[in-house]
Amino acid sequence: MTKLEVCCYSVDCAQIAEKAGADRVELCCGQSEGGLTPSVGALMQARETVTIPVHPIVRPRGGDFCYSSNDFTIMKNDIARIRDLGFAGVVVGVLDTDGHIDMPRMREIMSVSGSLAVTFHRAFDMCQNPMIALKQLAELNVARILTSGQQQNAELGLALLKDLVAATKDQGPIIMAGAGVRLTNMQKFIDAGIRELHSSAGRTVPSTMRYRKAGVTMCADSDVDEFSHYCVDGEVVEAMKSLLVMGSPLAKHT
């Protein structure tokens, strides 16, 4: 059956995702940056309170995936911490200046990761040649690739996603579709034979604060509503899981 990974920007969200039936959590912070490395405190709390597999992302900053020496050292230190805390996996990706997989650095990352299941994240979608990148990641023995099919959302990238699935039918990384995967379109990914789906399955919830200071923001973008935040919607996760069960080949023949 197709698995559902839920992208969570807090431990609260991870707990909601687990209760709603998610198969796995990708733990991040920094939603506006597309996901950054969670704090040590968040990692510790997730290990203590979430029982399904949690894969923290290791991404020291927003923007591209070509990192300075300091960035890369920080990434390796973070991966070692995640490994030592006993997480199931880690989500990471590094490119070189020409938009190819940075093989020397990825080999170092694989070595530091030890027994962690490594997901190569959507840095894959920024690669020059996805099929070459796929072969390189297979050589590295990464567990899975999170990808939108090199498009702004995974529905637009279905053609490449199908090619990637076909190329890994017998061996190689699991292809996990992500970016714009929703309850309303997930059947398309199931029908395409994609084994894992990645979704934030979220909604915006209002702040619990009653007093709200006007005219002052903490964000450089003063138009951002800082009295609301994004959170996993447990009902959506439950509905997505139900559809995955009904849409599985086994369910269709019972």
Swiss-Prot record:
Keyword entries, A-Z: Cytoplasm
Protein name: PF03932 family protein CutC
Organismal lineage: Bacteria, Pseudomonadati, Pseudomonadota, Gammaproteobacteria, Enterobacterales
GO cellular component, one term: cytoplasm
Family affiliation: Belongs to the CutC family.
GO terms assigned for molecular function: copper ion binding
Subcellular location: Cytoplasm
Highest taxon of the lineage: Bacteria
